[in-house]
Amino acid sequence: TPLAICRNRLEMLMEDDSLSEKQLEELMKTHQTLEYITKLNKSLLLLTKIDNGQFTDTKQLELNELLKQYLQDYEEVYDYRNIEVTIDEQDIFNVTMNESLAVALLTNLLKNAFVHNIDGGHIRITVTKNSITFRNSGVENPLDKEHIFERFYQGTKKEGSTGLGLAIADSICRLQHLSIRYYFEQKEHCFEISRQ
């Protein structure tokens, strides 16, 4: 893609030993901006594909297993910020859906719980037969539940965040006839996916 070509050219330029520190710093800022644009582009493309119903291949999935698999991938990052993660599997949440969309749904909620958490905080995940709830520590005020699932909405601006993660999760849930809701309870931000 043109963005990948630009990124590669920029990376090659950054390897030039004749660059001054100031020039290298400016190139690094440009590289960060390009990374953000690439991430934004991927998210918008995914939303468009979801909206156009382009994910037709489905299969029976056990969301518990997918969740545990991706939790392992994030383990090191959570440890770095000293965020304690617990998962309470009360039952198995089975669903028939596209596996890529299931992964996007779960990873967006995991990323959200991490990005909007505090150092030394926690993430508690509860899985039942009909729901998965992500609870995380974070800012001590509820978020605007009227706008939280809107595209580009950001309750608290985080560097590198596109403001599309929860909009993607919401679109996937609507496509799969699941519901997603946000609530604030006992100083925890809670996102619950459930069957309609």
Which residues make up each language-model segment?
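Short helix-loop "hinge" at the ATP-lid/N-box region of the Bergerat-fold HATPase_c
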Residues: 112-114
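Short alpha-helical segment of the dimerization/phosphotransfer core of two-component systems
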Residues: 30-37
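Conserved micro-motifs of the catalytic ATP-binding
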Residues: 52-57, 94-98
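Short acidic helix/loop segment immediately C-terminal to the autophosphorylated histidine
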Residues: 10, 14-21
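Short alpha-helical Gxxx[C/S/T] motif in the catalytic ATP-binding
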Residues: 165, 169
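Conserved catalytic submotifs in the C-terminal HATPase_c
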Residues: 59, 79, 84-94
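Short conserved segment of the HATPase_c
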Residues: 140-152
